[in-house]
Amino acid sequence: MLEKIREELNSYFLERREEIDIALTSILANEHTVFLGNPGVAKSQLIRAIASHINANYFEKLITRFTTEDELFGPLSIKELKDNDRFVRKTSGYLPTAEIAFLDEVFKANSSILNALLSIINERIYHNGDRIEKVPLISLFGASNELPEENELLAFYDRFLFRKVVRGIRSYENLSKLIDLEEEYKPKTIIDVEDVKKMQNEALKVDISNIKDDLIKIKLSLESEGIRISDRRFKKSVKAVKCFAYLNGKEKADENDLDILRHIYWNEPDEFYKVSVEIFKISNHFAGFALEQREILDSLMNEIKKINKDRIKLGGIEYRKCLEILGKLNSMSITLKDVKNKAIEANKPYELVEDVLKEVEGFKKYVEGLLKG
């Protein structure tokens, strides 16, 4: 069932393979995910689409500095207050009764609602007046254009096990597909919450004995690079690896399933590259090479931005610079195709190599267009 959902989502959401895998793993692991990124990269649309595949109590709210507790946790019961002098909220249909939840602009939450949010996502409880209500939450998804800066929000941010910076579509091929894409996503495969719980239990049975040493090596290696991983986050990450392996149809996890750790172990977006490099050293050096090529591609894109486009047609230094960049892109394309074939031969995941290859090919077309004028 999950494989069908995965396929449906990937067929519609272009260049969102990692985000989809993170979200589905998050649901299997009973954990929470935050997607970061500029407006317009379909963070909200993707989260809604994922939720549409599960027949669950769903709650969604756009958070502002002025969002009140009533809007998230439900209005006060006037009857309880009048008849019994009790301060109780009517929580039905609000966050305390949700199984899947989405808070957009999640880090705009004010201090008055943070403590309640922490109890809900941490302990799955809500303090409703003088009683404690159990919260059936499977996963809470957050979206934000920026990381939190206030200290009081950092503890809340830390409770999102999975983090991902969502980028705009980069490949020429996928931009072309985007033009013809239907406006509305329509799920075909829908599962019940009981199905989710059954899969969660099955995922916990995945054998990780082959990669225990690798898990420890990665943690120690990253900490030697100055990236601290708390014991709690490390323990939860082991469960995430099991769930990712299960998502990949395995009963026994292998080094390829360590890839999910790339979206767990960083705190600042600048750490993502360093974390990925260390993990790929153990799990998949083909993907590690592709990541290095993406860094080079980003630098070439920045070089193009600095060029005066109007002067390229004059055939001077700007034209020669574009030719030089095009030569590098041609070389990268040839190398990435070779690396992709080697990854396939070695039975290693090659999706990241393919993604970067498409990005290179797309940018190559753009540079060729500049040279043609």
From Swiss-Prot:
Which superkingdom?
Archaea
Question: A GO molecular-function term, please?
Answer: ATP hydrolysis activity
Q: Which InterPro entries match?
A: AAA+_ATPase, ClpA/B, MoxR, P-loop_NTPase, RavA-like_AAA_lid, RavA_ATPases
Q: What is this protein called?
A: Uncharacterized protein MJ0812
* Organism whose genome encodes this protein: Methanocaldococcus jannaschii (strain ATCC 43067 / DSM 2661 / JAL-1 / JCM 10045 / NBRC 100440) (Methanococcus jannaschii)
